[in-house]
């Protein structure tokens, strides 16, 4: 008697699958039975964020069949729930198979009578979001696995506002995709009655750049300091053309590249991980900065939604800023310039996530700008923008995980515009005789020193997941009495929407008298429980050590 997954293997070997796929399955049978089981023991889950998985043959892998099935489910949902004519914009990053998966997605949508707009080559998420809004499309799809390892790819679904889908649409799409149980249910080939597939080229880039240029705040400072030396690396990803073009359009003249990392390559050969949060991913760019005497390094990940930066400290050494520090500098710069230009009238707001530094709130309060605190994930920032559209103005928003956006043209993390504002802010600081590092110290001097850190505790297997669940129960029933020696004065339980005003989420926050906050949440994607520390005060380093000891037991 064959086990369940072997029956699925047999159906792929005997079914209407291409010969290359069958050959790879036979190779796994002979040489890697464990890998074979992992590839077929379940279906790759289409979750509320779309698909993400290792590429390869099988039901539990990203391949043309699983991508086709996801697209057919999405097409079925759109046709059943939206008024026609329907259209979708598609973009893709530099990962292996991204162009092929994008083309398969386009073919399936067209075969289902849905008009497709697809980029002619790799483009950042920001351009996909912008194109959805510009073309007034019903949805958008980005083929990417963000900064995951090279073995991965993914499929993100966006809605007509250019933001990732949220409830209830996300769950309804998931349910529709789940009904597509076999590739034979997919219309892979567009027939004579197919909708058109229209290619988008540089004209969309120009439209995007012309739009976001209207948001810039200090052209005089840039003109006076156009010679500041900037090193930019796309880390083999989709920022490779648009970011340098944006910086040049702003007027910057000394943009240095890392030639090896300007090569679009889904194997990311020069880095361990294409993640701008990792110091090693910026090492080559920092070396160029040291060689050329540059004061600023900027890096973006494969889909160009996150930005990592390095700046020169007072000793002349390049130091990496974390996502909270970059968001703080940008928020301070943008709100101060809005204030100086007379653009603030009480109808502006910023958005941060609940695990992002409270320094953003302190800065916004100084300028009389409202702050929204939302759940983790940029889709919740975009959700606030959608709800306030036409009433109040979104200035900027960010999260601790290196994502930031400015203005309402794009509804997701936008690394190209983040790079532009970091560069403009550097020029503005230079006009005052300061570096970005010194500007950050000035911000701390004015608003207080804020330090953020994170610990992740891994609990493996089924027992580990049960232990994590029990830890959350224990923290709810017996919250800590003190944090780093200061009494806890407030507990927020995000499973209670009636109290938070946010969708229910398994997150707890503890605030102490000193103004520190600890956020506890299980990871949505890994067997981990995460503790985020937001610490305020001159003794932040000591308090950080105390909290790490308190919560890593």
Residue ranges and their predicted role:
Residues 8-105, 195-226, 238:
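An N-terminal, well-structured beta->alpha segment
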Residues 12-16, 35-40, 44, 153-281, ...:
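Gly/Ser/Thr-enriched, mixed-charge loops and adjacent short helices
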Residues 40-60, 146, 230, 234-246, ...:
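Conserved phosphate/anionic-ligand binding catalytic regions in large, soluble enzymes, centered on
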Residues 89-152, 253-308:
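N-terminal small/polar loop signature for handling phosphorylated ligands or for N-terminal nucleophile
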Residues 99-104, 129-133, 151-157, 185, ...:
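Short acidic, glycine/serine/threonine-rich loops at helix termini
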Residues 290, 294-296, 317, 337-521, ...:
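Phosphate-binding and adjacent anionic-ligand microenvironments
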């Amino acid at each position: 008697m064959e086990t369940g997954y072997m029956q699925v293997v047999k159906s792929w070997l005997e079914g209407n699958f291409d010969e290359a796929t069958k050959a790879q399955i036979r190779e796994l049978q002979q040489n890697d039975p464990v890998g074979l089981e992992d590839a077929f023991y379940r279906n790759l889950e289409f979750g509320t964020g779309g698909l993400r998985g290792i590429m390869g043959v099988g039901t539990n892998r990203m391949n043309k069949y699983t991508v086709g099935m996801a697209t057919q489910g999405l097409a079925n949902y759109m046709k059943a729930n939206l008024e026609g004519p329907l259209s979708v914009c598609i973009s893709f990053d530099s990962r292996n198979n991204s162009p092929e998966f994008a083309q398969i997605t386009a073919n399936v949508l067209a075969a289902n009578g849905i008009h497709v707009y697809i980029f002619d080559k790799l483009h950042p998420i920001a351009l996909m979001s912008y194109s959805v809004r510009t073309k007034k499309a019903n949805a958008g799809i980005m083929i990417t696995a963000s900064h995951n390892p090279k073995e991965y790819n993914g499929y993100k679904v966006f809605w007509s506002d250019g933001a990732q889908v949220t409830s209830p649409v996300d769950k309804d799409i998931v349910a529709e995709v789940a009904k597509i149980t076999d590739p034979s249910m997919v219309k892979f080939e567009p027939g004579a009655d197919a909708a058109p597939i229209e290619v988008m080229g540089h004209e969309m880039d120009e439209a995007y750049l012309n739009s976001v240029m209207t948001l810039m705040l200090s052209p005089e400072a840039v003109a006076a300091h156009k010679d500041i030396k900037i090193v930019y690396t796309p880390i083999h990803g989709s920022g490779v053309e648009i970011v340098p073009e944006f910086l040049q359009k702003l007027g910057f003249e000394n943009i240095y590249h890392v030639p090896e990392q300007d090569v679009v390559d889904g194997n990311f050969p020069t880095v361990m991980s294409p993640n701008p949060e990792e110091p090693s991913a910026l090492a080559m760019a920092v070396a160029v900065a040291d060689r050329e005497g540059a004061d600023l390094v900027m890096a973006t990940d494969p889909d160009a939604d996150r930005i990592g930066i390095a700046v020169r400290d007072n000793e002349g050494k390049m130091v990496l800023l974390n996502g909270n520090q970059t968001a703080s500098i940008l928020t301070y710069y943008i709100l101060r310039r809005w204030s100086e230009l007379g653009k603030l009238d009480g109808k502006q707001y910023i958005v941060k996530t609940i695990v992002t530094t409270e320094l953003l709130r302190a800065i916004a309060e100084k300028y009389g700008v409202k702050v929204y605190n939302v759940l983790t994930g940029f889709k919740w920032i975009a959700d606030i923008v959608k709800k306030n559209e036409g009433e109040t103005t979104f200035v900027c928003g960010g999260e601790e995980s290196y994502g930031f956006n400015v203005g309402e043209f794009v509804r997701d993390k936008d690394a190209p515009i983040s790079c532009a504002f970091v560069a403009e802010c550097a020029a503005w600081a230079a006009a005052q005789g300061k570096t970005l590092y010194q500007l950050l110290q000035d911000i701390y001097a004015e608003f207080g020193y804020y330090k953020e850190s994170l610990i992740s505790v891994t609990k493996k297997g089924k027992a580990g997941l049960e232990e994590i669940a029990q830890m959350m129960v224990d923290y709810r029933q017996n919250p800590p009495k003190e944090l780093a020696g200061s009494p806890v004065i407030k507990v927020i339980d995000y499973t209670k929407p009636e109290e938070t005003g946010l969708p229910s989420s398994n997150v707890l926050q503890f605030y102490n008298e000193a103004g520190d906050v600890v956020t506890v949440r299980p990871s949505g994607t890994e067997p981990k429980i995460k503790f985020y520390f937001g610490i305020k005060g001159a003794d932040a380093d000591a308090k950080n050590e105390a909290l790490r000891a308190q919560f890593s037991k």
